[in-house]
């Protein structure tokens, strides 16, 4: 009887191991915290800059926290994106299947007041927030590892290329600190 129970237990353990996701080399390289930056396009009528603080976990979940900001003479118009997703990477392709997402304004009180009083800024604010409602639950990106701590990613939805750097353990850049501050102020998902 003991042998039967023991062999059944071992069989269950082995079958669980067989179905576990085997990480690709690219996935192993991605695990950790990254900061990514998209500079505004030189000739863009709307110079939007993005910073993303991305945490890739071994269990194939990812936590994205980012800001998009528009520099105006009145101050920064800021938007906060937070998302949770399942991720996979291989052969230069990174994909996300979103499980939760939150996109909200993160303007300073002064800038929010100016936006409220300006029809032009109000329309711009509305226009900027609305496209995310059509983002879908799946995103594919093309990635190129330049080194173990540097990569570029091309977002196939926004057609933007970001430059990414892997953060060392405990490292907090000024952009990461700003993102964490905004998440704390605005609430996390």
Enumerate the predicted regions with their spans.
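Bacterial N-terminal signal peptides
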Residues: 7-15
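Positively charged n-region of N-terminal signal peptides that target proteins for export
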Residues: 1-4
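Lipid interaction determinants
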Residues: 17-90, 95-189
């Amino acid at each position: 009887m003991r042998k039967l129970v023991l062999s059944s237990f071992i069989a269950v353990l082995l079958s669980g191991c067989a179905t576990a996701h085997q990480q690709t080399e690219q996935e192993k390289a991605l695990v950790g915290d990254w900061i990514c930056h998209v500079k505004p396009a030189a000739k863009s009528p709307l110079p939007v800059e993005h910073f993303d603080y991305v945490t890739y976990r071994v269990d194939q979940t990812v936590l994205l926290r980012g800001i998009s900001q528009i520099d105006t003479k009145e101050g920064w118009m800021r938007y906060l994106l937070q998302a949770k997703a399942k991720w996979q990477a291989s052969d230069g392709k990174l994909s996300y299947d979103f499980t939760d997402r939150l996109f909200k304004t993160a303007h300073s009180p002064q800038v929010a007041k100016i936006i409220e009083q300006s029809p032009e800024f109000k329309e711009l604010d509305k226009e900027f927030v609305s496209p995310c409602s059509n983002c879908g639950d799946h995103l594919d990106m093309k990635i190129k590892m330049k080194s173990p701590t540097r990569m570029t990613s091309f977002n196939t939805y926004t057609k933007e290329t970001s430059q990414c750097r892997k953060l060392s353990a405990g490292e907090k850049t000024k952009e990461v600190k700003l993102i964490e501050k905004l998440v704390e102020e605005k609430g996390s998902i």
